[in-house]
Design a protein with these regions (language model features):
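Globin-like tetrapyrrole-binding proteins
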Residues: 1-155
Length: 155
């Protein structure tokens, strides 16, 4: 799958100007929609966690033209997430919440094409992280609903 790098870069440049708002929305929505993930962050500084996640997003966008660099880094990130007790079923929760955060922060710039670009990018990120964590990618699929892109757990 060829990612729409130009659209990912341009839309993320708008997000970078609203980092705090984006991250606050992301985590408050994640915990509201999926309270079962909150214990994974029990011993975590949420301020540091938000900074780290945003740095990871910046890294991904800045390296979209370097697939080898991204592949290695995202597989390693998937491996590290094992020690945080992250399970395959958590990936769709994060993906859905990221897409919501993008839609809120991008507002009118969140077009069907932008949504598709980020959905496809997250699918690639998930596939690489799961392969690093040695989970089979077949457990997840990206499914298009009428107005909403949702990652669904097939188990």
């Amino acid at each position: 799958m060829a990612l729409n790098i130009e659209l990912l870069e341009s839309s993320f440049s708008e997000i970078k100007a609203h980092e705090a708002e984006f991250m606050n929305y992301f985590y408050s929505t994640l915990f509201a929609d999926y309270p079962q993930v909150k214990p994974l962050f029990a011993n975590t500084s949420m301020k540091k966690q938000a900074k780290q996640l945003f740095k990871s997003l910046v890294f991904v966008v800045e390296n979209l033209h370097c697939p080898d660099v991204l592949t290695e880094a995202l597989k390693a990130l998937g491996t590290r997430h094992i020690q945080y007790s992250v399970q395959p079923e958590h990936y769709p929760m994060v993906g859905s919440t990221l897409l919501k955060a993008f839609s809120i922060c991008l507002d009118s710039a969140w077009t069907p094409n932008t949504k598709q670009a980020w959905s496809e990018a997250y699918a690639v990120i998930t596939e690489l992280m799961l392969s690093g964590a040695e989970y089979p990618i077949e457990i997840l699929t990206l499914q298009q609903d009428d107005d909403q892109t949702v990652l669904r757990d097939l188990n």
